[in-house]
Amino acid sequence: MGSILMATIKEVKEQLAILRDLDDPRWASFEEDSRTGVQAAIRKRRKAILAELAEEERLEILLNYEKSLYARGIELIAGVDEVGRGPLAGPVVAAAVILPKLCKIKGLNDSKKIPKSKHEAIYNQVMKEAVAVGIGIKDNYVIDDVNIYEATKLAMIEAIEKLNPQPEHLLIDAMNLDLPIEQTSIIKGDANSLSIAAASIVAKVTRDKMMADYEQEFPGYAFAKNAGYGTKEHLSGIDKFGVTPIHRRSFEPIKSIIKK
């Protein structure tokens, strides 16, 4: 205890960082140090541990579907999701991801709930950890030809067919696919399955990069910012510069604009 009281605040912080359990008896020694800096460090570390425990619990819950399949001896489970159904421009992108058994990637969630600043890091972690990743892309011409729902299915099937090894079971975000693979359709799957969440972030980052490239090719529509969605800035670009080759002509207001 004497050595703790004699330690600098920096040294105390380093020792606190080692603690992982709120019931660790070493907390008592630190709490006897009345220095304001030490007490602040204790509160900060306790808060961090609580956040870590909450994240661990969240990830465990996200593995519920996967764990029920593991219990049946099924290990090659692919999460499948898409991004880009609603935009006025650009492709629909689907991803299929097989994660290792009981894999946990901190911060992984429905891509819409992940801060944009963290997208790239979590995407990189998924790509590093995954057993297999497949990506399917259907452009605006396919979307206009078969409709967005069917194009989404085609993108998902393409993503799954690119997986090596092939999955034994599919966990899909609110979709049923005509494939000879056992599958489970999950409403709001990207918020309820870790495998689907992994597919969600892969599809999101892949599509965002494509839209950023399209901004270079078609400036004036802010594609890197709006990802092709019908924002005020995007619609203003259409008014000024017209419809581009990547706009979906079966979507309003594009459909009405090209009829004028």
Curated annotation (Swiss-Prot):
Manganese or magnesium. Binds 1 divalent metal ion per monomer in the absence of substrate. May bind a second metal ion after substrate binding. GO terms for cellular component: cytoplasm; ribonuclease H2 complex. SUPFAM superfamilies: Ribonuclease H-like (SSF53098). It is found in: Cytoplasm. InterPro entries: RNase_HII, RNase_HII/HIII, RNase_HII/HIII_dom, RNaseH-like_sf, RNaseH_sf. GO terms for molecular function: manganese ion binding; RNA binding; RNA-DNA hybrid ribonuclease activity. It is an enzyme of class 3 (hydrolase). It catalyses: Endonucleolytic cleavage to 5'-phosphomonoester. GO terms for biological process: DNA replication, removal of RNA primer; mismatch repair. Its EC number is 3.1.26.4. A divalent metal cation binds at residues 81-82, 173. The keyword Hydrolase applies. Keywords: Cytoplasm, Endonuclease, Hydrolase, Manganese, Metal-binding, Nuclease. Its cofactor is Mn(2+); Mg(2+). Residues 75-260 form the RNase H type-2 domain. NCBIfam families: PRK00015.1-1, PRK00015.1-3. Endonuclease that specifically degrades the RNA of RNA-DNA hybrids. Belongs to the RNase HII family. PANTHER family: RIBONUCLEASE H2 SUBUNIT A, RIBONUCLEASE HII. This is Ribonuclease HII. It comes from Streptococcus thermophilus (strain ATCC BAA-250 / LMG 18311).
